[in-house]
């Protein structure tokens, strides 16, 4: 668990006391500042969205000594988890089935290929090159391949990872995923400057199939326009929804370290693995699809879209600010060099190898 999660558990979970309310007010105020700044001309010129500015502001606050007195662990966890998931669900109001259909089969095949390649290479590189335990290598690979910290926390029980291994894997996701927020818009601008014809939706699939966290995907794709952002979210949801079957596969292929029942009971192990996968299922992804279905059927009036978008952006900005406060560079470096190096190699593989997979699938699809 991260430091914030440990503090949150020690404090008894979510308690709306005076400090919590003050922290929520500060969180909302900083997110509001990021939203206002993100709407200015200079931010648009620099390609900085409200979400990018929110995480930058959070990173700045996170390095201020004593900020935990106001931003409690409960406040951070509420923003990182509850508000983030609610924001992802509301994002469905921006999507329609027609947009999903327009991505075609490649929009599903690409993220699944990237996921499989990252899991396999991550487990091999982590154990053979960097000497990590099998459980830690799988954790780092899952965080990079599926959906960031949520995947790490879901996979940890399946491989019986220690709290330290879990915390290090989450730290790597935060570090390289945050770097990706700034890298992908720059890569898109570089491609445009070089005269490479890349459709925004195709680049959105590239972002969604290779970047770690859901919030990071949205933040990286937003500056590129609605087509890129929507495609990125749909592509990312394919990876998120793959978490449940991945947990079953991991539990069944790692019996020595994973979810084991009675000795020799393969059927019992499978039942337990399936139960864990069901409990760890990212239901917010299903919620996003449900809202997208409502929007496709015209159940969401056009006059509601603007306020829903504003509320959604506010929730996501709060989540990005909270994630930023946890991106404390000295703390990340103390978490361990070898796991971070492994995560760095996987990140390079996602950026370069993911681009090759995206290009290859689209070439084969004609």
From Swiss-Prot:
Under Pfam families, the record lists:
Cons_hypoth698
Q: Where are the transmembrane segments?
A: 21-43, 103-125, 137-159, 169-191, 198-220, 240-262, 283-305, 343-365
Q: What is its main location?
A: membrane
Give the UniProt entry's GO cellular component terms: plasma membrane
Q: State the membrane topology.
A: Multi-pass membrane protein
Would the keyword Lyase be found if you checked this record's keyword annotation? no
Q: Tell me where in or outside the cell this protein is found.
A: Cell membrane
Q: Report the superkingdom from the record.
A: Bacteria
What keywords sit in the KW lines?
Cell membrane, Membrane, Transmembrane, Transmembrane helix
The record ties this protein, via InterPro entries, to: UPF0324_pro (IPR018383), UPF0324_YeiH-like (IPR004630)
Q: Which family does the similarity line name?
A: Belongs to the UPF0324 family.
Q: What is the name attached to this protein's record?
A: UPF0324 membrane protein RSc1111
Specify the species.
Ralstonia nicotianae (strain ATCC BAA-1114 / GMI1000) (Ralstonia solanacearum)
Q: What is the lineage of its organism?
A: Bacteria, Pseudomonadati, Pseudomonadota, Betaproteobacteria, Burkholderiales
């Amino acid at each position: 668990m991260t430091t914030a999660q440990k503090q949150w558990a020690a404090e008894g979970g979510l308690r709306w006391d005076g400090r919590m309310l003050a922290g929520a007010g500060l969180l909302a105020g900083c997110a509001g500042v990021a939203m206002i700044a993100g709407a200015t001309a200079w931010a648009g010129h620099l390609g900085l969205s409200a979400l990018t500015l929110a995480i930058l502001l959070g990173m700045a606050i996170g390095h201020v000594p004593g900020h935990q007195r106001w931003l409690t662990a409960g406040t951070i966890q509420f923003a990182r988890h509850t508000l983030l998931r609610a924001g992802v669900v509301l994002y469905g109001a921006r999507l329609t089935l027609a947009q999903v259909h327009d991505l075609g089969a490649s929009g599903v095949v690409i993220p699944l290929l990237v996921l499989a390649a990252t899991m396999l290479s991550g487990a091999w590189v982590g154990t053979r090159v960097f000497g990590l335990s099998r459980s830690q290598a799988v954790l780092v690979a899952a965080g990079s391949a599926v959906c960031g910290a949520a995947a790490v926390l879901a996979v940890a029980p399946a491989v019986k990872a220690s709290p330290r291994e879990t915390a290090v894997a989450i730290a790597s996701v935060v570090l390289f995923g945050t770097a990706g927020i700034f890298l992908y818009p720059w890569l898109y601008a570089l491609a445009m400057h070089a005269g490479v014809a890349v459709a925004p939706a195709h680049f959105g699939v590239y972002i969604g199939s290779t970047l770690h966290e859901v919030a990071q995907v949205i933040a990286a794709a937003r500056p590129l326009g609605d087509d890129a952002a929507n495609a990125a979210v749909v592509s990312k949801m394919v990876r998120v929804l793959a978490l449940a079957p991945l947990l079953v596969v991991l539990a069944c292929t790692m019996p020595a370290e994973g979810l084991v029942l009675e000795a020799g009971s393969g059927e019992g192990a499978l039942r337990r693995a399936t139960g864990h996968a069901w409990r760890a299922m990212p239901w917010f992804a299903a919620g996003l699809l449900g809202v997208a279905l409502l929007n496709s059927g015209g159940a969401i009036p056009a006059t509601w879209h603007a306020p829903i978008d504003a509320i959604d952006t506010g929730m996501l900005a709060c989540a990005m600010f909270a994630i930023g406060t946890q991106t404390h560079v000295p703390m990340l470096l103390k978490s361990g060099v070898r796991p971070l190096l492994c995560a760095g190699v996987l990140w390079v593989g996602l950026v370069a190898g993911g681009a090759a997979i995206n290009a290859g699938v689209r070439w084969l699809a004609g």
